């Protein structure tokens, strides 16, 4: 959102990149964004993506993997609240919504929870907003 000030934006989807390309913020992108021209840092997609195909491109998880790789011991995160299986209002910007079935959303929630649990064994994750992934 434009009303939130930040130093960097982490992007691994071209659709989201197009929303931030002209914003005055530093961009960290992943190597799968072959058409991207305006960025500050590019990371190897395969190095930080999840093994599970259903959540392979989850930007929140990719960012957490990157931060862990950088040696960050504690992360505070907002907005990683989990998918609403009714598939309504999962994103602040409705233009970023995906068309998933309730079963797909439930599977994603379970896989993300498992991945976050594994990450929490290596780093402290503090959820600033309500999240189904908070343990």
Language-model features: where?
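Metal-ion/cofactor- or nucleotide/acyl-coenzyme-handling active-site neighborhoods
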Residues: 1-135
